[in-house]
Amino acid sequence: GPTDHPCNECSVCKSILSGQSMDVLEIDAASNRGIDEIRALRESVKFMPVEGRKKVFIIDEAHMLTNEAWNALLKTIEEPPDHVMFIFATTEIEKLPVTIVSRCQRYTFRRITSDDIAQRLQYVADKEGFALEDNAARLIAVHADGGLRDALSILDQCVGMASGEITPAVVEELIGLVSKDWIIKFLSALHN
């Protein structure tokens, strides 16, 4: 059942880790933000979990839900069935209705360090079989400002853009940065 220390070995853990669990449902509120989607969610809340003790609904980008959608969900949040848990993920908590936030436990996560993001990008590059220069990984990590999803999105775009190894020049071109070499040349020209 639910625990702070999952075993990662049982069938429930394995189905959650593989993204195949019928008891953990993620909804992207950025693209499913209306009342119809929330009504469908309310219907599925009625059903018991298939494998585990809880049915978990993760609503990502929760700040994107419409007011009508929140109003439709309010009653369910106020009196959720014992077998249901909601997780509202957002980067803009101030956009969530106060009536919702007041009924939730709030967990604030710190931004991921640039070093950790750069390491993860190198891991992804190794697993996917493409070359990523360390300085390019660091540049992406700094530009992502603590957001791993943003960093992975930039990396994905670099892969599509690069004809070989992903270098700092590829990253600079993609995100519109001026290279150090150009800045040095510019400052040198100003000085002379």
Model-derived features: positions:
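Extended, largely alpha-helical regulatory/partner-binding modules appended to the mid-to-C-terminal parts
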Residues: 8, 15-22, 40, 53, ...
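P-loop/Walker A NTP-binding region and its immediately flanking N-terminal helices
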Residues: 1-106, 124
